[in-house]
């Protein structure tokens, strides 16, 4: 067998392995949050980026073996940004045989009129886009709206709110839309961005650049993203542990009087969630919570997360 054939077999093996992991992650998120139910019509929001392409591909894959029947309709919003390649998504979706709708709205013109040159346009653009997508979901009879945010997006939002907003608030895997009419789901909630990047490269999705509008990136989010990438590289398992923490919240050991009745504690109260452990040295597991080392991660024991002294 030639060297090229050996490489091809190895690449295919790695792709299959990666797809299985993404499929498992998406399947677990769907089950944990009851994202998809019998007869659902899922509107898959397709931007032309790696995340939404991956979401559509994995949902199509799961559709073949899911215990419930559901349909997919891909929707792209053409915001009339200069240089937007209008042919790419229709051609791609036609070849897949996926039902789709391209919505044309000149939100770019509205944003450029309202926002001064050089300022970030993302906030206004996002609000306009959200309203259009809600309207489109109603027109298409969609029961769920699927967005392509992944685990790293959720963690970034948590830290953004803590560092700059003074609140512990992330990005929910499932929620009721702003207009109170639509259920929004994030099937990639358990997926790592680096897995999505590798999958996207291997599948050679026709990526459409996200900065055609010329808007400046959100600098705060970029700082948080760089911080998380640095932690993931230097302390394997830290990202997984932090995401596990978001699923293991103990309100009685925080300080939000709206989540726990601190005023109601008296001499007749029971011990709640282990009482006061502030002065006890907890037993810290060697392996960070939620982390499973993988063959291709090349993670070293000496780089494991030191939970006692977080750097």
Swiss-Prot record:
Molecular function terms, GO-annotated: 4 iron, 4 sulfur cluster binding; ATP binding; magnesium ion binding; sulfurtransferase activity; tRNA binding
Motif placement: PP-loop motif: 47-52
Record field: catalytic activity: cytidine(32) in tRNA + S-sulfanyl-L-cysteinyl-[cysteine desulfurase] + AH2 + ATP = 2-thiocytidine(32) in tRNA + L-cysteinyl-[cysteine desulfurase] + A + AMP + diphosphate + H(+)
The record's free-text note on cofactor binding: Binds 1 [4Fe-4S] cluster per subunit. The cluster is chelated by three Cys residues, the fourth Fe has a free coordination site that may bind a sulfur atom transferred from the persulfide of IscS.
Record-listed [4Fe-4S] cluster binding positions: 122, 125, 213
Tagged with keyword Hydrolase: no
Main location, first listed in the record: cytoplasm
Summary of the function given for this chain in its UniProt record: Catalyzes the ATP-dependent 2-thiolation of cytidine in position 32 of tRNA, to form 2-thiocytidine (s(2)C32). The sulfur atoms are provided by the cysteine/cysteine desulfurase (IscS) system.
The protein's name: tRNA-cytidine(32) 2-sulfurtransferase
Species this chain originates from: Citrobacter koseri (strain ATCC BAA-895 / CDC 4225-83 / SGSC4696)
């Amino acid at each position: 067998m030639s060297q090229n054939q050996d490489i091809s077999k190895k690449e295919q093996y790695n792709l299959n392995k990666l797809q299985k992991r993404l499929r498992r992650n998406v399947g677990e998120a769907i089950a944990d949050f009851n994202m998809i139910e019998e007869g659902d019509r899922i509107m898959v929001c397709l931007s032309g980026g790696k995340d939404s392409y991956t979401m559509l591909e994995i949902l199509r894959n799961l559709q073949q073996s899911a215990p419930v029947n559901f349909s997919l309709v891909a929707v792209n919003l053409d915001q009339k940004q200069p240089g937007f390649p209008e042919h790419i998504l229709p051609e791609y979706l036609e070849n897949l045989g996926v039902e789709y709708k391209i919505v044309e709205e000149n939100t770019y013109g509205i944003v450029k009129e309202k926002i001064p040159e050089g300022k970030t346009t993302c906030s206004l653009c996002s609000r306009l886009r959200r309203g259009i997508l809600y309207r489109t979901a109603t027109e298409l009879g969609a029961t769920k709206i699927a967005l392509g945010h992944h685990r790293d997006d959720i963690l970034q939002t948590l830290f953004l709110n803590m560092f700059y907003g003074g609140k512990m608030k992330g990005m929910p895997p499932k929620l009721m839309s702003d207009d109170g009419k639509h259920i929004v789901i994030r099937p990639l909630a358990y997926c790592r961005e680096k897995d999505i990047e590798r999958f996207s490269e291997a599948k050679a999705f026709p990526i459409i650049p996200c900065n055609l509008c010329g808007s400046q990136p959100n600098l705060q989010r970029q700082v948080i993203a760089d911080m998380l990438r640095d932690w993931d590289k230097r302390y394997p398992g830290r990202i997984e542990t932090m995401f596990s923490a978001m699923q293991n919240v103990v309100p009685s050991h925080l300080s939000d009087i709206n989540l726990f009745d601190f005023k109601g504690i008296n001499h007749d109260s029971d011990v709640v969630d282990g009482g006061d452990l502030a002065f006890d040295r907890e037993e810290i597991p060697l392996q960070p919570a939620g982390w499973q080392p993988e063959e291709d991660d090349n993670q070293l024991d000496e780089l494991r997360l030191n939970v006692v002294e977080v750097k």
